[in-house]
């Protein structure tokens, strides 16, 4: 599976999580790319909750991605910490 990041995602993910945690997220998506809930009316964008640091999923991160099934590609689009909201 190929991962493609938008420039804004790349910038955000370096601030939001360490490299080893991002690798865990990528592995989780390789194993279950359908894990994120589809955002209604988005054309297939998905939002996944991901724990961050010492906090659980509820206080962690939200990451937006698109899974292109025929191309076997995940586009990492955006992310934010729930604490930023």
Task: Kindly give the residue locations of the regions a language model identified.
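Enriched for short, Lys/Arg-rich terminal
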Residues: 67-85
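Short, surface-exposed coil-to-beta transition loops
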Residues: 58-63
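Basic, Lys/Arg-enriched alpha-helical interface segments
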Residues: 1-55, 71
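Short, charged/polar low-complexity linear motifs in solvent-exposed/disordered segments
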Residues: 29, 64-65
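Residue-level signature of transmembrane alpha-helix interfaces in integral membrane proteins
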Residues: 18-21, 65, 76
């Amino acid at each position: 599976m190929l991962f493609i990041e938008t420039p804004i995602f790349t910038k955000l993910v370096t601030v939001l999580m360490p490299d080893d945690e991002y690798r865990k997220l990528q592995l989780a998506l390789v194993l279950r790319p359908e894990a994120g809930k589809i955002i209604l009316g988005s054309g297939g964008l998905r939002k996944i909750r991901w724990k961050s640091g010492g906090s659980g999923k509820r206080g962690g991160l939200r990451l937006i991605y698109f899974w292109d099934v025929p191309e076997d590609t995940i586009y990492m689009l955006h992310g934010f910490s729930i604490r930023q909201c």
